[in-house]
């Protein structure tokens, strides 16, 4: 099944619901970064969370960055997700592997670490970003993002994330986000929020449902079918996509300055650059570096004549 995002409402618009299936894009991230089992689960959960948050943005070019910086051996996670359905991300130490948790599951919480912060930066397409920071709750990512949504954005939220990694790769990945919209007077419906939390808590997890063959509309129907569920007919496809390019690499190298470029030409006969987000390697020839040097000299000459 293609990776996709499904939106819905319930309780006469008081509940906003969105679900994302991100199995393929999580597997692509695993392959690109050569991730361990626990690193795959951690990055996969964070990418799903990013897509769920970005799904509420109005502008197509709007994006959100999630950075988890805990005290665990993964060393940090950074994800960039957009309202256009694209997402990318990486972990600092992708090869880290840990024994299973006491429950027999991948120990994402210990890999990330419970002591640290979640940094969120939103670019809503208006020319200036919005940022928020909250302390990590458990390092399990779902708890941490929920804590951010409730405390920083002040929206009652229930979030479920999951990644199942088998011997041959990612079998299932994605998540659900249920939110109670404030009333006209700004008051929260605490009873409704508690109901959503109980219903999500009663589910054994997102990936078991997906692996049993259920699709997102079916899962939403089970959770909210008795609450006036309305599923939007438009299904948005989501994918792993990075915005890096040879041109951007050259632009970054140019910013290093003439002296550094000349040193690369003399000592290395070129340059090699790797994109952190997608692990794409770019080889830059000496002739391309020489062109950058010429551009810098020309720009400096023009500037001196002004």
From Swiss-Prot:
Q: Where in the cell is it found?
A: Cytoplasm
Q: Name one Pfam family in it.
A: HSP33
Domain of life per record? Bacteria
Name the InterPro entries on file.
Heat_shock_Hsp33, Heat_shock_Hsp33_C, Heat_shock_Hsp33_N
Using the record for this protein, list the coiled-coil segments as residue ranges, or answer none.
none
Q: Which GO terms describe its molecular function?
A: protein folding chaperone; unfolded protein binding
Q: What is this protein called?
A: 33 kDa chaperonin
Identify the species of origin: Gloeobacter violaceus (strain ATCC 29082 / PCC 7421)
What lineage does the source organism belong to?
Bacteria, Bacillati, Cyanobacteriota, Cyanophyceae, Gloeobacterales
